[in-house]
């Protein structure tokens, strides 16, 4: 079935292309943001969420797509940066098959400029449905599978590197670690941290998930609003972005922030505030790059899990270099990581 799609180009400065896509017939309302394709096709996840307003959705997709550029360049995927959001109608918690198929046709119309993958609110099985309408997807079950496994592993390795920087040992035994959000990545990360001997404090809005992890991992459940100011060794944000903001940044009681969430800082300038307080911050687009590496290394080539694992294992080495530069120059890690990316991008201009 061919869906009657309506396209509207939104002219946004510093973005190659931003397109609003609608199809009233199936209630599709989406935005595809292509930040840059200098390095390769714009690769990024599809997020489905019931936003309060279109402006909220646009702000989210613009920040996320730019973050994908930085994530791709710093981790060396050979891809560009893009992202998309499906704005779910009020009361809808998951995209319907028609919405996914219509969205797939929208992606297909871009002829490979944007390659879609799973993200919050969109499962691997949803990507399989989108794949029925376009070949421009990655992370499907028959090829590279669920990328959250590699996202969680990359964050875990970066947490261990952060422990090494803080205490001279990568051991997490007895370390108090707070995980905010137990979605597909957060739960896998919790599993690794449990077996590493960490003392775990968790929050989530899903009571069933909390009951399950309490039973099987013996975690301590804290209220959602306990983060990010909960006293702990390492705070691990794995839910929405902007969790660290002007109203709470001076009240953090952790030694480090290392998480899977995108855009953890409401504003990049808060990196300097964390640095001034002696709080180590692992740039989010580096720590959570494992999932992107998993799907990107299947684009245009045969998928090899050992190659993916090797690339993900390099993330803490990059983080170590950034931490050391931060200590040597007294600059915050956000400025340093951004400057590394921007320097690499100039080589393509």
Feature map (PLM): residue ranges:
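Glycine-rich phosphate/diphosphate-binding loop of Rossmann-like nucleotide-binding domains
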Residues: 146-234
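Adenosine-phosphate binding glycine-rich loop
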Residues: 163, 255-349
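Flexible, glycine/charged-enriched surface loops at secondary-structure junctions
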Residues: 72-77, 113-118, 167-175, 326-338
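Rossmann-like adenosine-cofactor binding region
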Residues: 207-282, 287
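N-terminal ligand-binding/catalytic initiation module
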Residues: 1-142
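Buried hydrophobic packing segments
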Residues: 61-64, 155-163, 292-296
């Amino acid at each position: 079935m061919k869906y009657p799609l309506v396209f509207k180009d939104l002219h946004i400065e510093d973005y190659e292309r931003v397109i609003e896509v609608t199809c009233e017939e199936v209630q599709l309302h989406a935005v595809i943001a292509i930040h840059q394709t200098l390095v390769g096709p714009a690769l990024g996840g599809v997020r489905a969420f019931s936003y309060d307003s279109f402006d909220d959705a646009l702000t989210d997709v613009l920040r996320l797509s730019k973050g994908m550029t930085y994530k791709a360049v710093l981790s060396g995927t050979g891809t560009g940066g893009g992202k998309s959001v499906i704005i779910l109608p009020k009361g809808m918690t998951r995209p319907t098959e028609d919405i996914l198929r219509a969205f797939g046709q929208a992606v297909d119309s871009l002829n490979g400029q944007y390659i879609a993958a799973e993200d919050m609110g969109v499962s691997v099985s949803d990507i399989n449905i989108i794949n029925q309408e376009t070949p421009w997807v990655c992370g499907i079950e028959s090829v590279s599978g669920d990328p959250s496994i590699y996202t969680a592993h990359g964050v875990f390795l970066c947490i261990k590197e952060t422990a090494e920087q803080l205490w001279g040992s990568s051991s997490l035994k007895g370390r108090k670690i707070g995980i905010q959000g137990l979605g597909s990545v957060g739960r896998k990360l919790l599993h690794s941290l449990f077996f590493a001997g960490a003392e775990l404090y968790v929050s989530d809005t899903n009571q069933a998930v909390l009951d399950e992890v309490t039973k099987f991992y013996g975690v301590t459940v804290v209220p959602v609003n306990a983060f990010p100011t909960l006293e702990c060794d390492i705070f691990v944000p794995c839910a929405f972005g902007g969790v660290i903001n002007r109203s709470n940044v001076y009240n953090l009681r952790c030694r480090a922030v290392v998480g899977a969430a995108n855009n953890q800082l409401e504003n990049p300038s808060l990196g300097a505030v964390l640095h001034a307080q002696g709080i180590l911050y692992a740039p989010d687009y580096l720590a959570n790059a494992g999932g992107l590496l998993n799907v990107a290394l299947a684009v245009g080539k045969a998928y090899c899990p050992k190659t993916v694992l090797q690339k993900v294992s390099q993330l803490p080495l990059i983080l170590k270099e950034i931490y050391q530069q931060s200590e040597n120059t007294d600059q915050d890690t956000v400025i340093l990581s951004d400057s590394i990316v921007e320097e690499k991008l100039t080589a393509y201009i």
